[in-house]
């Protein structure tokens, strides 16, 4: 079921969000200011923006240009909506690492709620193919990432890709072509601990097109990282070397 409100008042929008945002995908377009506090600090002045709130706690904010959002919060974030004097606020809080996204809405042009079911996401290619893409453009992982060796053999197995981040910290990457599970996190953690004990510092990240809720919780508990491989796949959708097939999407 899909619901749409056009030019809702702040009062209407507040009650709509409280009723729907925990079970449905929310999209809204309105005039807002944004503050972010966490690993850095940023402030986005009043402008019209598209805001997406997902059932898993993800929040994404887009402006009128570029593919990447100007602000976002990952799955597992806690979202609080408040109706304050003359504004509607949406606060997204991530506990670890501690981050806070604060959106102040002054006017809404539309607000939607939709039931969206998960579909299958199949990549016609192997982990090796995805690693090849990263080696061609290391910034797909993050700015300044420097790959050193693929299939790096250690006593606990073979690391898909080993490198260093821009600060010189050893960075272990484990790639999966499908939704990551607890087993994948445990595998990464063994590799990560080896490099942590060997170098005194290390980072470990799991790269996959999806991750189970339990696996994501374990990632955060073990102070590892998750990289959504969809960012990488976006860059290859026009490439003949790979086929991305999304099927079994149910529509209401």
UniProtKB/Swiss-Prot annotation:
A Pfam family reported for this protein in Swiss-Prot or TrEMBL: NucS_N
UniProt key word Magnesium: no
NCBIfam families named in the record: PRK04247.1
Function of the protein: Cleaves both 3' and 5' ssDNA extremities of branched DNA structures.
Subcellular location: Cytoplasm
Keywords, comma-separated and alphabetical: Cytoplasm, DNA-binding, Endonuclease, Hydrolase, Nuclease
HAMAP family for this protein: NucS
EC identifiers of the protein: 3.1.-.-
Organism, as annotated: Sulfurisphaera tokodaii (strain DSM 16993 / JCM 10545 / NBRC 100140 / 7)
GO molecular function: DNA binding; single-stranded DNA endodeoxyribonuclease activity
Keyword field contains Cell wall biogenesis/degradation: no
Protein name per Swiss-Prot or TrEMBL: Endonuclease NucS
Sequence similarity: Belongs to the NucS endonuclease family.
GO CC annotations, alphabetized: cytoplasm
InterPro entries per the UniProt record, alphabetical: Endonuclease_NucS, NucS_C, NucS_N, NucS_N_sf, tRNA_endonuc-like_dom_sf
CDD domains with a match to the protein in the record: NucS-like (cd22341)
Major subcellular location class: cytoplasm
